[in-house]
């Protein structure tokens, strides 16, 4: 078995050792099948409700992918509202503090004082030929920015073999904050998909793809370099993720627990200005109006 892959029954010390070495671990079969099915069924109901509210007549009993794709064929924007709902639907909210997840978070962070980054909960629906929504090589810290040792939990709701585009990781790359460029227009025109880009190239073929099955859970370090996989199949890649940090990490406490991003604000400019190589190029709103 790969050094980053563990069964749910593995001892926590070994899991932590693998995590600290690689910046990522996969816990196989961590979530039971019944719970996953409940998550998927709630998801399917949300898709049906949104489609029908828009006057789209979906036949009863369609598989989740088919229902979602038919809705998006009429109006792709409806998929965005499904995403926004699913970020905080009941099955997601119940999972965030569940011991089935948090026992691993505590081991990886080395503390029981866990901060739940509720504003960093996401639901992804990655489809074929929609690479514009995929993220290139990045560190979650740029967006999350709670602490440098924060942990992301990524849960696939479906099997993610090679053709569905598993996440690609640069193992052991979690030792420093990478040099980045920020979108110099972020205070004027907010585009979350282009906020950050690496200032230093990554050799793509050094990355390791980590295929996963529904029920596996991936835990990744805030600084580990990774990128979205490209979905080349006809099936959709459904996944849920959230983030955690040490509540009493000195860096986090010193900034009053401020974190993340919001329109017109990137906290990494306050915490790690030396890592933003183009910070002198940022355009202020008043500059844009007088240009």
Report each predicted region and the residues it spans.
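Double-stranded beta-helix
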Residues: 162-225
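Extracellular structured ligand-interaction cores
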Residues: 24, 148-152, 164, 207-209, ...
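Non-heme Fe(II)/2-oxoglutarate
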Residues: 5, 49, 53-58, 73, ...
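Active-site region of the double-stranded beta-helix
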Residues: 114, 139-146, 155-166, 172-174
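Non-heme Fe(II)-dependent double-stranded beta-helix
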Residues: 1-21, 28-137, 143-144, 266
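Short, conserved beta-strand element in jelly-roll/cupin
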Residues: 145-162, 211-214, 219, 243-247
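Short, solvent-exposed loop/turn segments at secondary-structure junctions
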Residues: 31-33, 123-124, 142, 160, ...
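Glycine-rich, charged/polar anion/phosphate-binding loops
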Residues: 137-140, 154-155, 204-206, 224-227
